[in-house]
Amino acid sequence: MRSQVSMSFDSADVAALETDGTWEAVILHEMAHVIGIGTLWSSSDVGIPGSQELYVDGSGQYTGATGLAAYQQEFVGQESATFVPVELGGGGGTANGHWNEGDGGFATGITRVSDGQDMNLMLMSGWLNGGSYISDTTLGSFEDLGYNTTLVLNAVPEPSSALLLLAGFMGISLHRRRA
């Protein structure tokens, strides 16, 4: 599938964003939208038959499998979550296209297991906050959209090679004794 996209920025804001150190975050944030975060979550909106429906506008509930699994592991107390909360406030351009945070960029009280940072600091939340990070939840959403990422979720533990080798030798020994 081919597509053409563009990004444009209000040049009047660039100097202030550079001064406060958030210009790079703004560019990364907008690039993520360009390649699908919050813009290609609904296959019915973009006319891609057979695609997974990741989000229904107005629901506030992102349900993509990998993004949700990442959210469950990444944030404290979210192990049994059935969706990732999506922003419904802020109007057009913010609602339905960003991870949820308190309207105006305020903290949610949902914090990362790894470092205690609040969900409102995620790069793909709807309000610009200093110290933004690219969350595993966002990487999972990219995977849900079909991109390959470096996201590593906790998998079901596999037996060690030595244990598998030992089991194989035991199986061969038992087979030889019967024959």
Sequence positions of predicted segments:
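A short, hydrophobic C-terminal helix/tail in secreted or cell-surface proteins
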Residues: P157-H175
